[in-house]
Amino acid sequence: MNGNYSAPTEVGRWQQRALIIGVVFTLLFAMGAFLDRSQFFHSYLVAYLFWTGIALGSLAILLLQHLTGGAWGLIIRRVLEAATRTIPLMAVLFIPIILGAHQIYPWTHHDEMSKTPALEEKARLYLNLPFFSGRAALYFAIWILTAYLMNKWSREQDRIADRRFTKLMRMISGPGLLLLVLTVTFASVDWAMSLNPDWFSTIYGLLFVIAWALSALAFVIAVMSFLTNREPMSRIVRPNHFQDLGKLMLAFVMLWAYFAFSQFLIVWSGNLPEEIQWYLPRLRGGWGAIAVAVVFFHFAFPFLLLLSASLKRNARKLVMLAGLIILMRFVDLFWMIAPEFSPEGFHVNWMDVVAPIAMGGLWLAVFAWQLSKRPLIPINDPQYDSVLAQAPAPAHADH
């Protein structure tokens, strides 16, 4: 080994605190199931999609990094790998969605799907609980297998300095990324778009793909800022590493805005009743103010700030912006999902706040546990020497 790259002891304390928060808020959230069963599952779905997005977005960025061979990915690879190893947890946490499908999805109600021949055909061929559950099982099988192979070969590369593992990871990254995009697209249709079985959008799935990748990248930047203040990453990470991550975050912010605006423009220009029905409740009754906030704080504000090279090189400032993006990712997701349950106007229930904290505590505890299990740097990677050759300057030095 070329040095001690074990995770700092603070990661263990982080795990304990996250677990305590997760357990306490899970117990509080569980009480909500007895008070309002429907609201419980509505809040659960939003929280689930948010944290699953970070796990799957991390897998997407991990595959992208291996595919492109970018040196920017060496310092964040172990953070990404740890996040992908939480996917089995999300598979288990999907079970309540199946159990509560009748409270979540209108297509589980026969009277709803018998209104038109088109809806009856959808229910017969696609929107039915057995097929819905089977597709979810297939998605998770693909995601877990892909994450398992990437982590297995990375672990073997730590043990044996063999370039064969680098080639294997690159070989699977192309098909794996394509398969991930396809499965996430279908999953977003199943889990989110089918909340309104009358409505469809060909851009909706891609919007989820980009949004989840953006969530994951912002989360990675937050974790890297935490690790950079401590050994061993304090002597490895340089301002240019954060600049590379900032550039990538700017690209994802722009891509998200492009797809979101494209979908809105197509629906607005078509002005067809079956298409505008999705946007109408989201632009009225208080939801419109949320939409404006998303435009400004999810796109305009981050876009303008990320144009600054000095901000991207400053870890303190960049992590604050990453935190804002993580918050706005949840707000945007809530804006996309919640109006289906309260189309009459903006409404926030206490379970909408408790659910993401409960699930987030459990997810972060598993993430921290996985992060502490392996060295923070893949020491036998072919790019190791070139990336770490220069003596680093403190990542927070630039202002």
Predicted regions mapped to residue ranges:
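Juxtamembrane "helix-exit" motif on the non-cytosolic side of transmembrane helices
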Residues: M31-Q39, D190-P197, F334-S342
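Hydrophobic alpha-helical membrane-insertion segments
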Residues: R85-H102, A251-A260, L321-M328
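Long, contiguous internal "core" modules enriched in hydrophobic/ aromatic residues
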Residues: T9-M31, R124-V294, L311, D381-Y384, ...
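Non-cytosolic membrane-interface motifs at loop->transmembrane helix junctions
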Residues: F41-L49, I76-R78, N196-V209, L280, ...
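N-terminal regions that are enriched for targeting/export leaders
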Residues: M1-A55, R124, S386, A391-H399
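Transmembrane-helix bundle segments that line or gate the permeation/cavity pathway
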Residues: L49-R159, S173-G176
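Hydrophobic cores of alpha-helical transmembrane segments in multi-pass inner/ER membrane proteins
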Residues: A55-L63, A91-P96, A136-Y148, I210-S225, ...
